[in-house]
């Protein structure tokens, strides 16, 4: 599903060149549940941006579902993101002036789905998350756990092949974090590849494979006992 070979990524800051990813190799198969760990500055956030087609890379190759992600126009990159990927963030990234249903339906708006259809689908996914009764509520009326469930429903509604989650439990208490990880497990059980970036060991242990990144390369990886 995801193949990286010799991936390099650098940033220019003033007169300095910051080499973040240094020839990284990685393979994640279809239907895997994987966590990516690393300290601040290890390159894990940059890696997630490349995987999410939010940033380019300098050298090497990145294949998503056997398609090379290279030299993409903004329009083409957006098409791949909308059709292949779902995103979940630590800060939820919900639109404050839209209710839960409207937030969940948003990806379908960009795909040209009619309002009636996308709202029906949004209600279906909110129901799956146990939030059907919260459809008309605004983000500021919901708890952190509820907001993250809305964000997960939004990521799922376009039926992506891969979910990319960046510190999805970072703003949640321990019990809610475990509930969210159980949701990711259920999503993964349907055949969707789930990749979670985290610095929390107990969260990584809820995935099937843990990849540790250090100084822009994979330092180690192992199968979780989960």
Question: PLM ranges: what are they?
Answer:
Residues 2-213:
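ABC family nucleotide-binding domain
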Residues 225-226:
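ABC ATPase nucleotide-binding domains
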Residues 210-222:
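H-loop (His-switch) and adjacent beta-strand-loop-beta switch element
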């Amino acid at each position: 599903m995801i193949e990286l070979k010799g991936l390099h990524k650098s940033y220019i800051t003033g007169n300095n060149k910051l080499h973040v990813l240094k020839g990284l190799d990685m393979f994640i198969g279809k239907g895997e549940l994987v966590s990516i760990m690393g300290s601040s500055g290890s390159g894990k956030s940059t890696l997630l941006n490349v995987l999410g087609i939010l940033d380019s890379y300098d050298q090497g190759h990145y294949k998503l579902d056997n398609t090379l992600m290279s030299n993409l126009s903004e329009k083409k990159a957006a098409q791949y993101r909308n059709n292949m990927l779902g995103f979940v963030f630590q800060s939820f990234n919900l639109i404050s002036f839209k209710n839960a249903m409207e937030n969940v339906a948003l990806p379908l708006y960009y795909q040209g789905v009619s309002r009636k259809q996308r709202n029906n689908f949004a209600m279906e996914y909110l129901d799956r998350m146990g939030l059907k009764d919260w459809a008309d509520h605004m983000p500021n009326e919901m708890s952190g756990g509820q907001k993250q469930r809305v964000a997960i429903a939004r990521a799922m509604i376009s039926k992506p092949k891969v979910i990319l989650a960046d510190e999805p439990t970072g703003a949640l208490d321990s019990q809610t974090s475990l509930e969210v990880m159980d949701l990711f497990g259920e999503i993964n059980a349907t055949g969707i590849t789930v990749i979670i970036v985290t610095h929390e060991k107990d969260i990584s242990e809820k995935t099937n494979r843990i990849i540790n990144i250090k100084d822009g390369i994979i330092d180690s990886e192992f199968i979780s006992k989960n």
